[in-house]
């Protein structure tokens, strides 16, 4: 330690700052905006579910809580219908455009049948989740979903969700098939089909 440092360490007088440079509005426990971004435990720290800016932010909570699975005020059957319609509608395109019959005149119908088959497989998985011997797991409230639907996590509620999912999935696939079949896509379809066959 140098002599200069020793003189400061051995001095007993505290360092005085000019009063005009001291901000008295800031307290030692005041962390300001950082408190909004702090990572906190939701309930039990042993669970491992932390409230972060990502999973407890306004946009994330609004988006997740507006999905049909968590939206308040709708029945389990309608939850399944809406979820299944989205799945069926979105499954139709990949099966039609990348399926083995994509270059034939039966591509649209083959895509429809494949999408309905996939919806049947997903419905079978939902039925197995509600298999005898165990009840569906009830989701506890967490940082993202404050009020999970209680009526969905019963045997009857899950069965209603599953039947709605099947009907919505088949209906969504048929709706996509009708849209593609009735729109004038004769000029666009060959271009899209050649993207996957080139090479």
From Swiss-Prot:
InterPro entries linked to this entry: PSI_PsaL, PSI_PsaL_sf, PSI_suXI
Pfam families: PsaL
Cellular component annotations (GO), alphabetically ordered: photosystem I reaction center; plasma membrane-derived thylakoid membrane
Keywords from the UniProt entry: Membrane, Photosynthesis, Photosystem I, Thylakoid, Transmembrane, Transmembrane helix
Keyword 4Fe-4S: no
Domain of life: Bacteria
Annotated membrane topology: Multi-pass membrane protein
Subcellular location per the Swiss-Prot or TrEMBL entry: Cellular thylakoid membrane
GO biological process terms held by the UniProt record: photosynthesis
Membrane-spanning residues: 108-128, 165-185
NCBIfam families linked: PRK00704.1-1, PRK00704.1-5
Family: Belongs to the PsaL family.
The protein's name in its UniProt record: Photosystem I reaction center subunit XI
Phylogenetic lineage: Bacteria, Bacillati, Cyanobacteriota, Cyanophyceae, Synechococcales
């Amino acid at each position: 330690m140098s002599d200069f440092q020793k003189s400061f360490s051995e001095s007993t007088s505290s360092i005085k700052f000019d009063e005009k440079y001291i901000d008295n509005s800031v307290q030692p426990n005041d962390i300001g905006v950082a408190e909004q971004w702090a990572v906190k435990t939701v309930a039990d720290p042993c669970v491992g579910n932390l409230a972060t800016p990502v999973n407890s932010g306004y946009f994330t909570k609004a988006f997740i809580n507006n999905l049909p699975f968590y939206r308040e005020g709708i029945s389990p059957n309608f939850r399944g219908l809406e979820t299944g319609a989205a799945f069926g509608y979105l499954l139709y395109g990949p099966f039609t455009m990348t399926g083995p019959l994509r270059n034939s005149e039966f591509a649209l119908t083959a895509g429809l049948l494949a999408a309905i088959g996939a919806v049947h497989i997903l419905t079978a998985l939902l039925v197995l989740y509600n298999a005898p011997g165990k009840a569906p797991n009830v989701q506890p409230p967490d940082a993202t979903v404050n009020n999970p639907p209680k009526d969905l996590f019963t045997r009857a509620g899950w069965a209603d969700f599953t039947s709605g999912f099947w009907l919505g999935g088949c209906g969504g696939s048929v709706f996509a098939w009708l849209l593609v079949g009735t729109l004038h896509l004769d000029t666009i379809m060959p271009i899209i089909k050649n993207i996957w066959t080139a090479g």
